[in-house]
Design a protein with these regions (language model features):
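Bacterial Sec-dependent N-terminal signal peptides
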Residues: 2-17, 23-25, 29-61, 65
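Flexible "stalk/tail and boundary" regions
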Residues: 46-331
Length: 331
């Protein structure tokens, strides 16, 4: 929805005398001309929905069975700008975008499909390959070189080296004794691999692997009752979805992660209550935070994506009609 503000030129009269004195007449004439120009151009226009500069980025989410959706940012409607069709009728479980705008889409059953940029209107996968021997693709992340990291909801993380083809197989399988159930995955500016891990049903923690990802990772303390899912990084902050029905939140950590790291603060406004469960998170180039839900908060809210503006202390905007539990933002 757009807000339109129109400036209308007018001349104020007081006791039948113009308030523009002769000494200020040139300035008044200039101001009147400027205001008239604004009115002729329709005044100022701004989007009521937070987002990056128009035309610079897109939001990618899971869609109908066998599809992922692309939305232009800022979000101004519920109609996708493009549909990405998988080669099989499988539900989308993960999405990621590389630095050039190529999109990776993971699906239940263990397949990963790559859609080459630019994506407009509708797109078909250029290549599809398996996530190793796993039947799950929980989350995906690209590094700056275009290599793809895929979690398996188990004690392994598969790495696929660029360029990706239909014959791609894991070039590396990352594992360690303290990786139990890897779910979310993210890479910081130093290419440290951060994994959201669930060592037991009693809670979750974070593991940090330094390149080349063969050593024992840094492990944070387990957060009781937490169920960590998708993650996203903006500058020196790591955003981690803590998914619990009726009590979801986003835990925010300061980078770099150490063994002593704990959430610096949390975001729960708009994520708490009803049957809602948070799952997805992404950030745009303006550091606006997008949170994806499953379930709903009541009869008037069916779980539209939430958009938070830094410093993330206020109520979110709700992207009505745009739903997704796994998210990515990119070109």
């Amino acid at each position: 929805m757009l807000d339109h503000n129109y400036a209308v030129p007018r001349c104020l009269v007081y006791r039948k005398r113009l308030l523009c004195s002769s000494s200020r007449l040139p300035l008044c004439l200039f101001a009147a001309a400027f205001i008239a120009c604004l009115a002729a151009c329709g005044g100022s226009t701004k989007s009521s929905v937070p987002g990056p500069p128009p035309g610079t980025q897109h939001l990618y989410i899971n869609g109908a069975t066998g599809q992922a959706f692309q939305f232009a940012l800022p979000l101004t409607g519920s109609t996708p700008s493009a549909t990405l069709s998988l080669p099989t009728a499988s539900d989308v479980s993960a999405v990621a975008v590389d630095t050039t705008g190529n999109v990776a889409v993971g699906a239940f059953g263990g397949t990963i499909s790559i859609f080459n940029a630019p994506i407009t209107g509708s797109g078909s996968a250029s290549v599809t390959f398996k996530n190793g021997t796993s039947t799950l693709v929980d989350n995906l992340a690209f590094n700056s070189a275009g290599d793809l990291f895929a979690t398996t909801n188990s004690n392994t993380i598969n790495v696929f080296t660029h360029p990706l083809t239909s014959a791609s197989t894991p070039s590396q399988v990352i594992t360690s004794v303290n990786l139990t159930t890897g779910v979310g995955v993210a890479l910081d500016s130093a290419n440290n691999l951060i994994v959201s891990n669930s060592p037991s049903p009693a809670g979750s923690n974070l593991l940090v692997y330094a390149p080349p990802y063969t050593g024992l990772p840094i492990a944070t303390a387990v957060v009781p009752a937490a169920s960590y899912r998708q993650m996203a990084i903006s500058g020196t902050q790591l955003f981690v979805v803590n998914s619990n029905v009726s009590a979801s939140k986003i835990d925010v950590y300061s980078l770099p992660i150490t063994a002593a790291s704990a959430p610096a603060f949390l975001i729960s406004n708009g994520l708490f209550g009803g049957s809602v469960s948070g799952n997805g998170v992404a950030l745009d180039s303006s550091s606006n935070l997008y949170a994806g839900l499953s379930g709903n908060l009541g009869t008037t809210d069916s779980g539209g994506i939430r958009i938070y503006v830094p410093p993330f202390s206020g109520a979110p905007s709700v992207a009505n009609g745009v739903f997704g539990f796994t998210l990515a933002v990119g070109k």
